[in-house]
Curated annotation (Swiss-Prot):
PANTHER family: AATF PROTEIN APOPTOSIS ANTAGONIZING TRANSCRIPTION FACTOR (PTHR15565), PROTEIN AATF (PTHR15565:SF0). This is Protein BFR2. GO terms for biological process: maturation of SSU-rRNA from tricistronic rRNA transcript (SSU-rRNA, 5.8S rRNA, LSU-rRNA). It holds the Pfam family TRAUB. Residues 94-103 have a biased composition (Basic and acidic residues). GO terms for cellular component: nucleolus. Residues 19-196, 486-505 are annotated as: Disordered. Belongs to the AATF family. The keyword Plastid does not apply.
Length: 581
């Protein structure tokens, strides 16, 4: 069946209709789109009926065409269904978009559209009329009046059209100005928005950078603090381990006692010479380490506050004494050692360097003590109205506390306390003396240095720090004995030999007993006699004469079976008393 041809009215309607074309791919004439509704409200069927209304067709032809259409239409069996909600919403939104004010046009008449052409033609007519007027200036008056009237009418019409055109142009200019101003406002708003967003991004980036720098600084500070604490703990452990050496040194006898022992032979003075050389080398190492640390600590400060190490150390560095062989050389060597020239030189260097570092040391102590001290506690104490807050030793600077402790006879009293040997051990007395520590408890000795008070304070501080660290890690409270053993043993614990796989009955636990001595269990295989023979033996032992025994044996032999003949023959062969063969 050929497709239906559209009329001129339907084609014109498609040009004036802004709605999209509804295309049905399953329609018989799918290659030609069908247009549903036009802008004027008429449909395709109405236009065709209007245009082809004069054509008359027979009823039979219509029926045949309908049957052919049903056969050719693949959707003939479909039921009529209303438009879905989705299509309605789509059409509604589309109509809303089309009805937007931006797409509205301006109504105008055909005269306004052709006003420009009419004005151009009218201007040419005016020129022609002027030329005619110049040619016919001597014409009749009636013609001039008619021409004047006609010109007036033309001028009125042209002026009215020109006013309408100007008004329309003014409206267009106003609309253009409004659109331009709105575009400018939108552009400025977008620019301000972009600028604000860029400013926010830059601000957030700067804040993130500052936070990152602060976080890195805090992390570095924490690492340095941890490193300092670890160094301090190692130094404290070294001091604790050196306490045993100091205790043994305090037990050395008086110089008058071991002078005779040292000068007796060269073999006795040789260890003293080696020990003195090693001590002097250790002193040089510690002194160089101290000067190095002072240089590193003052690297970031002003050079005026730096203290230089003594360049001329007057002590005898080259203490290299050979082991003497003769008695006179031994006495001279011991006299040189007992003069303490090398030790005095070392002490002078240490004391002079310490006195030079005292201002710097006091300044550093006060600075870091002020940073460590809690300012909140001081502010709270001041707010409570406590006038004696500054008099407390805790709230004072370390230099002030040291000065107050050493004021008056404080220094002499502390020095005298260190010259008393105080120890609870049994061997706390000096070698070569018979008195115990209880007898010499209050006796001062210039050759003794016992800082038990300071050592106890250091040990207590270390134990508290270790216990706090273990409790923070979840280990709970730790006894002092365990911590002391860890300090003395270097933190290594003795591992017991325990089989961990033998728990919960996974291995059989048993103990091997020792072998029995002088014990023999009964062996039944070695006994050849039966119960009758044993019973007969005991009857023989209990009988008073051999006749009774023979009579009893004769009766027993008669009562035995024939199967026991061999046994009875063996018994008869026994001439005398025989026990167990």
């Amino acid at each position: 069946m050929p497709p239906k041809t559209s009329s001129l009215a339907s084609l014109l309607g498609t040009l004036t209709n802004a709605a999209p074309v509804d295309f049905d791919p399953e329609a018989p004439d799918a290659d030609q789109p069908t247009f549903t509704t036009f802008a004027n409200g008429s449909d395709d069927a109405a236009s065709e009926s209007g245009s082809d209304g004069d054509e008359d067709e027979d009823g039979d032809d219509d029926d045949d065409k309908e049957e052919e259409e049903e056969l050719m239409n693949p959707r003939a069996h479909y039921a009529d269904v209303a438009t879905s909600d989705m299509r309605k919403r789509a059409a509604l939104s589309e109509s809303d978009k089309i009805n937007d004010p931006r797409y509205h046009g301006v109504k105008s008449s055909r005269a306004e559209l052709y006003a420009d052409d009419y004005n151009g033609e009218h201007a040419s007519d005016d020129d022609q009329d002027d030329q005619d007027d110049q040619e016919d200036e001597y014409g009749s008056d009636g013609d001039q009046d008619e021409d004047a009237d006609q010109d007036d009418e033309d001028m009125e019409v042209a002026s009215s059209k020109k006013d309408k055109k100007l008004r329309f142009a003014a409206d267009n200019d106003e609309s253009d100005d409004d659109s331009d101003s709105s575009q400018v406002n939108q552009t400025s708003a977008q620019a301000s928005t972009s600028n604000s967003i860029a400013a926010q991004i830059a601000q957030s980036a700067s804040q993130a950078k500052a936070l990152k720098a602060r976080r890195l600084e805090d992390a570095e500070k924490g690492r340095q603090v941890r490193k300092q604490i670890k160094t301090y703990e190692r130094t404290l452990e070294t001091r604790i381990k050196a306490q045993s050496v100091l205790r043994d040194i305090n037990r050395l006898p008086d110089p008058q006692v071991y002078q005779q022992a040292m000068t007796s032979s060269s073999t006795c003075i040789e260890p003293a010479i080696v020990l003195l050389e090693q001590l002097l080398e250790l002193s040089d190492t510690l002194f160089s380490l101290r000067t190095r640390l002072n240089t590193l600590s003052n690297s970031e400060e002003e050079e005026d506050g730096m203290v230089t190490a003594p360049s001329t150390r007057k002590r005898k560095r080259d203490f290299d004494v050979t082991v003497p062989e003769h008695q006179e050389e031994v006495e001279q060597t011991w006299t040189q050692i007992a003069s303490h020239d090398q030790i005095d030189a070392v002490l002078n260097d240490v004391v002079g360097y310490s006195c030079a570092l005292e201002p710097h040391r006091r300044r550093v102590l006060d600075k870091w003590s002020l940073k460590v001290t809690s300012a909140a506690a001081a502010a709270a104490a001041a707010s409570n109205g406590n006038r004696f807050t500054q008099l407390r030793a805790v709230n004072q600077a370390p230099s002030s506390q040291i000065d107050s402790a050493l004021a008056g006879d404080g220094l002499s009293r502390l020095v005298a306390r260190t010259r008393v040997l105080r120890s609870e051990s049994e061997g706390s007395f000096k070698l070569g003396s018979t008195s115990t520590s209880l007898d010499t408890e209050e006796k001062q000795d210039s050759e003794v240095f016992d800082d038990t008070d300071f050592y106890s304070t250091l040990l207590k501080e270390l134990i508290e720090r270790r216990s706090n660290g273990l409790s923070n890690q979840g280990g709970g409270t730790t006894s002092t004995a365990v911590l002391l053993s860890s300090l003395q043993g270097g933190g290594k614990k003795k591992k017991h030999n325990v089989d961990t796989k033998a728990s919960k009955g996974r291995k059989l636990r048993y103990e091997v007993n020792d072998k029995l001595v002088n014990f023999m269990p009964p062996i039944r295989d070695r006994i050849k006699w039966g119960p009758e023979q044993i019973e007969r033996l005991f009857r023989q032992l209990a009988s008073s004469s051999m006749g009774v025994v023979k009579h009893v044996e004769a009766q027993d032999m008669q009562s035995d079976d024939e199967g026991q003949g061999d046994d009875m023959a063996k018994d008869a062969q026994l001439a005398g008393l025989r026990v167990f063969g």
